Amino acid sequence: MLKRVAIFASLPLIASCSLQPMHSELIPYYQVETAKPYEEVLTELEIAIAEHNFRITAHSRVGKVIRERGAENFPDFDTIQFCNLSLAKTMLDINPAAIGFMPCNIVTYQQAGKTLIKIHLLPENGDNPALNTFAADMNRQLKQIVDFAATP
């Protein structure tokens, strides 16, 4: 009987734990599919990145390298990292911890006959209103880059 009383008495404490908001480190993504040829998508991404005044800092052709190492039919997977130093400075002036969101990173790969383009976005719902405003503007530009590359 005492055991049951202890269990029932602890239920509000246990339930209150589940009511606590969970801190999430999840990064929102924006993804678009296209029927455009893979290499054309990569070229269009490079153009769109440059038109938005970003500079490509790295391009990793992961699928190609895996094929070169013997996996003949391995599909294409690419990552393109890019940055705009003026925007980076603005973001870091707002919050130095935002360095974790840099550089911007787009991934492309093929699946089920389509080319997928995926980019992680900056969180817009943090505690810093200035950073949220900055993130919303950046996310608009990042989506425009992806959409440009995906549009036939």
Task: List each model region and its residues.
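C-terminal partner/receptor-binding element of secreted or periplasmic proteins
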Residues: 122-152
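C-terminal motif of bacterial Sec signal peptides marking the signal peptidase cleavage site
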Residues: 15-16
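N-terminal secretory signal peptides
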Residues: 19-75
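Bacterial N-terminal signal peptides that target proteins for export
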Residues: 1-6
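Compact, glycine-rich, soluble single-domain proteins
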Residues: 51-52, 57-104, 122
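Beta-strand/loop substructures that line and gate deep hydrophobic ligand-binding cavities in soluble
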Residues: 102-128
